[in-house]
Amino acid sequence: MRVKGRSSKKFRKKVLKLAKGYRGQKSRVYRKAKEAVIRALKYQYRDRRQRKRQFRALWIARINAACRANGMTYSKFINGLKKAGINLNRKSLSQIAILDPQAFKELIEKARQHVA
């Protein structure tokens, strides 16, 4: 006789292994563990996408703060960089703003020349 799928014991073991470290029944009772694991996997999937958005927002906030400290707005700065043909992504602009303020000031001057 052919058996379809894997044994239920193996599947339950896998779910309980994923639920290891959870508090209370969620780590010991299969039904509760299954619900907790499914919920955790949903959050994991959602948050992998949210992380990208949150980091982009953080980079933009840092660039904006550095721009305003040098007397320019973020939107004018980005527009000036585009017109100047400087192709730097927001992550690297953020790093430059934090680690090398003098170089960032030069970028602002270049952007200022192309905006006005």
UniProtKB/Swiss-Prot annotation:
> rRNA-binding: is it a keyword of this entry?
yes
Identify the stretch annotated as signal peptide in this record.
none
Keyword set, alphabetical order: Ribonucleoprotein, Ribosomal protein, RNA-binding, rRNA-binding
**Highest taxon of the lineage:** Bacteria
The answer, when asked if Metal-binding is one of the entry's keywords, is no
Q: What Pfam families does this protein's entry cite?
A: Ribosomal_L20
Instruction: Give me the Gene Ontology terms describing cellular component.
Output: ribonucleoprotein complex; ribosome
Question: Which InterPro entries does its entry note?
Answer: Ribosomal_bL20 (IPR005813), RIBOSOMAL_L20_CS (IPR049946), Ribosomal_protein_bL20_C (IPR035566)
State the similarity comment. Belongs to the bacterial ribosomal protein bL20 family.
Name of the featured protein: Large ribosomal subunit protein bL20
Classification of source organism: Bacteria, Pseudomonadati, Aquificota, Aquificia, Aquificales
